[in-house]
Amino acid sequence: GGFSTNLESTTMRLVENTNEMYGLQAQHFQHQPELDGRNCRDCFLQRHCLPNSLDDRSRTALSEITAHPKPFHKGRYIYRQNSPFSSIYIVRSGVVKTYYFDERGDEHITGFYLPGEMFGIDGIGRSNYRYNAQALDTTAICAIDYNTLENLYPHFVEIQQQVTATLCEELFERQQSLLNIRQQAAE
């Protein structure tokens, strides 16, 4: 209802400000291929992203298993609730909303993801994604095949540590959000 619309409107303003801060616009990916680095070492989001603290060897290994699909236009799904889990994703530009529908068909927003943030982790340990992931703006992403990523762990402990740290941060942020909601409800 109204809360969801206001939240999306506020999020879109945040995205516009974030994209402006990074100098990002969807046309950069279509008309300026030099900004569309095909490896983590050359990516303009490097310092805001998962590979930020990786050494060159680990960053190269991660780059080799990262796909760069064409940008998703506003409203397009990156994946749908209950679709087979295959990859985790990092936003390069735009914004992604994750949400699910309950048994009654009511939508529940679970997150908004901005450039440099990881999503798709809702499928880890399962065979399918729990949520829908939808582009709210023209959105470019990096897709990391999760099975291949797991196969790198024994050889690149640093990658495993960074992914684990990112997952822990995501859990912490969700806990903080729940605490904030509970505090607001109590007031």
List each language-model region with its residue ranges.
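Cyclic nucleotide-binding regulatory module and flanking cytosolic helices
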Residues: 11-74, 118-119, 123-124, 155
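Glycine- and acidic-residue-biased ligand/ion/polar-headgroup-sensing regions
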Residues: 75, 86-99, 115-116
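Cyclic-nucleotide recognition modules
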Residues: 109-173
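Short phosphate-coordinating micro-motif centered on Lys-Gly-acidic
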Residues: 78-83
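A short beta-strand-loop-beta hairpin characteristic of the jelly-roll/cupin
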Residues: 97-108
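N-terminal positioning helix adjacent to the helix-turn-helix/winged-helix DNA-binding module
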Residues: 179-186
